[in-house]
Amino acid sequence: SAGVEVDNVTVVGDSQYNDTVNGKTQFPTVADPRGTDLNQAFIQYQVREHQIKVGRQKIGLGNERFVGSVGWRQNEQTFDAVRYQTNLGDDWRFDYSLSNKVHRVFGSESAQGQWQSDLHLVDLHYKIAASSQFKFYFYSLDFQAAPLMSNQTIGVDYQHIGEFGLVQWQLFTALATQQEVGAQPMDFRANYKNIELQLTRGVFQAAFGYETLGSNNGVGFMTPLATLHKYQGFADKFLVTPSGGINDGQIKLGYKRKNWDVGVQYHWLSSAVGEINYGNELDLNVAYSFDDQYSVLLKMANYDAEQLATDTTKVW
């Protein structure tokens, strides 16, 4: 099979925001510059449990904390890559991607719109049981155009789903370590930790989590290819990890019933080293689906700065 996808971003009215290429740096950033891009163009072949995909494509690994397509942005992140996936027996799954260019959300007119790269992305999934699984991963990211973003990460995730009476619960934990690779001029070794407990009863959900992106030698643990909008608040104040790293304590509440999907979350954000209180953020989203094709979404982010950045409110 094969696929081709083109996207176009057009601004309606006056853009009172910094889209990263319009020069309006006095406004908060909304990284959706106007333009037309070839988003995907690939061929794909599958035989039994083996699948290979060649060309420009989206790559989303797991929860997209390290590699994703940044689906919230109007122009998605894609990769010129070869990707191979296969099952190794009943319990193991192998996923490897090799890429030499990243097409980022900023579009072709931006100096940061494309990164020449040498990427090796390896995921190895192991299913212990229907309710439990591990993921082992190795990501080597070498960027010629952005050497300070070059890094090599090795880590493991664990996920378990269970029930306690009428409550379904899900535990997610992750540990990783990161160091310099390729063009990176800095020597560092930073760690990553994440734990989240999610509870669901009927139409209500609650989640409690604590995530740490550590720091070493003045370099914060970085995830330049992640779907970053999903993490550390919708205001996007932490797209680049500060030199002191980040601690993110968070509470999320949700309600899903029929056509409605409502969520609220609160983040306590501070440095991983140095005891710096960055600020707090409150996020809200309300979505209504008319059918399988049409929906509306209201979304709000309010970042209350303490010792990093400035107070910011965004509404979509």
Please annotate each region the language model reported:
Residues 1-49, 80, 90-91, 250-254, ...:
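Transmembrane beta-barrel domains of Gram-negative outer membranes and organellar outer membranes
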Residues 24-28, 62-70, 77-79:
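Short acidic, glycine/Ser/Thr-rich loop/turn "cap" segments at secondary-structure junctions
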Residues 17-19, 28-33, 160, 175, ...:
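Extracellular/periplasm-exposed beta-strand and loop segments of Gram-negative cell-envelope proteins
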Residues 33-69, 73:
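Well-ordered mid-protein domain cores that form the structural environment of catalytic cofactors
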Residues 2, 48-52, 70-218, 249-251, ...:
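Signature for the C-terminal beta-barrel architecture of outer-membrane proteins
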Residues 7, 55-57, 267:
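Short, well-ordered beta-to-alpha junction loops that form the rim of enzyme active sites
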Residues 8-12, 58-61, 103:
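Solvent-exposed loop/turn segments at secondary-structure junctions
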Residues 219-244:
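Flexible internal linker/loop segments at domain or repeat junctions
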